[in-house]
Amino acid sequence: MTKYVFVTGGVVSSLGKGIAAASLAAILESRGLKVTLLKLDPYINVDPGTMSPFQHGEVFVTEDGAETDLDLGHYERFISTKMRKANNFTTGQIYESVIRKERRGDYLGKTVQVIPHITNEIQAFIERGAASATCGEPDVAIVEIGGTVGDIESLPFLEAARQMSLRLGRNSACFVHLTLVPYVATAGELKTKPTQHSVQKLREIGILPHVLLCRADRRIPDDESKKISMFSNVPEDAVISVWDADSIYKIPQMLHDQGLDRIICDELKLSPKEADLSMWSELVEKLEHPKHEVTIGMVGKYVDLTESYKSLIEALRHASLHTSTKVNIEYIDSEEIESNGVDSLKHLDAVLVPGGFGRRGTEGKIAAIRYAREAKVPYLGICLGMQLAVIEFARDVVGLKQANSTEFDPDTPERVVALITEWYDREGKVETRTESSDLGGTMRLGSQRCPIKPGTMAEEIYGKDVNERHRHRYEVNNRFVPQLEAGGLIISARTPSEDLPEMMELPRSMHPWFVGVQFHPEFTSTPRDGHPLFKSFVEAALANKQARGAEA
């Protein structure tokens, strides 16, 4: 039977519940247990797909095409279990499901209330999510409850967790509470009162945490841990210090060294083998002792909030681990390029344009792409970054001066990039879209496989075919492909059913490394293996740096 660990947060948000939950999962997996994770989000949106990156950060796409919280990306990077749609749900989905049942008459005329109907539905979603785990029936399901204890929107989720713990019985569920222990510089000491009050809030609703994870900018002294233990009624050895680290991949070892996994296993009456965190130690060793160093410029419009590119940043870090190369990322606002030109790019070893939406900043990205192509600087374009690379090539090489995307200019006569109106999803069902379709949940989403053209750089990187995740509603227009290919551009991968261009590149006779992909390879990169596309990109950046150094 699956046992549950509920992870809650207190005092403030953004303390790192997702990293803590993923790190615990990684330790338990290293002990031979089958583990899955779920994220419960208390907002009323059905999913984060239409939320601003400035408010929510990255939208992580699962294999089965769900638009989910970025914490699911952390989960997949830390454990081997793949996430699915059932691993993330929101208040919006819960209420939508309950209202549908009420309309069907499932409640037989009863008054539908938060308790028991909403809380029962939350419990059903949790158990369904655990049961759908790709690892088979999990030994442990770690459930991260979003928001902060005390927030009104989190109360139904906390109440559902309390009821579920009671229903499952002793040794079947436990609670881990992550809280802040701030350092007050003027007083010169850590303050435990916010943690005490946060635990008090939990106890008011009937939840007694078994473990406290105390976030601070430094290790918490024993005297402070004893004080927290006494006032929160949590054993002293279960008051665990989680201090700031320069890499999230150090957190599993930090938690294991303080016995978190032992406490959880004892509470759940599990007796797995000892933890083997040698892989994490090796990763940290590689991270701290690179042999080379490169600087890659990421040109986008969300550069002031790097959470918008979380998986992409981590994918570059994974590539750095597997190429022994420290990757410095410079975030460059594409609107600044529009105003000031490309001088800010000239010291870079490579240029990357990530995915995005909307017209704002696109001409700056196109200018950056033009610079990378003409200066022979390695270039990687992802999703929108590929579409803009095709537009730049069409304008400046092929001579289609009005080339554009209908996303930015619906009336352009040279629709090099246009809305996809029909395609097959990963189950083989036909999806259709028009300009008037809803924005939410209407993109081409999820993992799709396509063959690669022999003799291309794409084949060198991936092999015979590619299976990556998508999140887009616009695509390179096949009508213009013959003109693009006549100019030298190579479409190196296409979908087998709809013949949609999935990858483009320039031949080495035109450029040493210039690749665009319509999919999002960052979603499948892990620290264990890295990703072949990002490894090749970092190697190209290093080769460019060394060539420029030799010329100098």
Curated annotation (Swiss-Prot):
NCBIfam families: PRK05380.1, PyrG
Name of this protein: CTP synthase
Binding site for ATP: 14-19, 71
Catalytic activity from the UniProt record: UTP + L-glutamine + ATP + H2O = CTP + L-glutamate + ADP + phosphate + 2 H(+); L-glutamine + H2O = L-glutamate + NH4(+); UTP + NH4(+) + ATP = CTP + ADP + phosphate + 2 H(+)
A GO MF label: identical protein binding
Name of the gene: pyrG
Enzyme Commission no: 6.3.4.2
Gene Ontology biological-process entries: 'de novo' CTP biosynthetic process; pyrimidine nucleobase biosynthetic process
Coiled-coil intervals: none
Region (Amidoligase domain): 1-270
Record key words, sorted: ATP-binding, Glutamine amidotransferase, Ligase, Magnesium, Metal-binding, Nucleotide-binding, Pyrimidine biosynthesis
Pfam families: CTP_synth_N, GATase
Positions contributing to UTP binding: 13, 191-196, 227
Domain Glutamine amidotransferase type-1: 295-547
Disulfide bonds: none
Subunit and partners: Homotetramer.
More about this protein: CTPSs have evolved a hybrid strategy for distinguishing between UTP and CTP. The overlapping regions of the product feedback inhibitory and substrate sites recognize a common feature in both compounds, the triphosphate moiety. To differentiate isosteric substrate and product pyrimidine rings, an additional pocket far from the expected kinase/ligase catalytic site, specifically recognizes the cytosine and ribose portions of the product inhibitor.
Pathway: Pyrimidine metabolism; CTP biosynthesis via de novo pathway; CTP from UDP: step 2/2
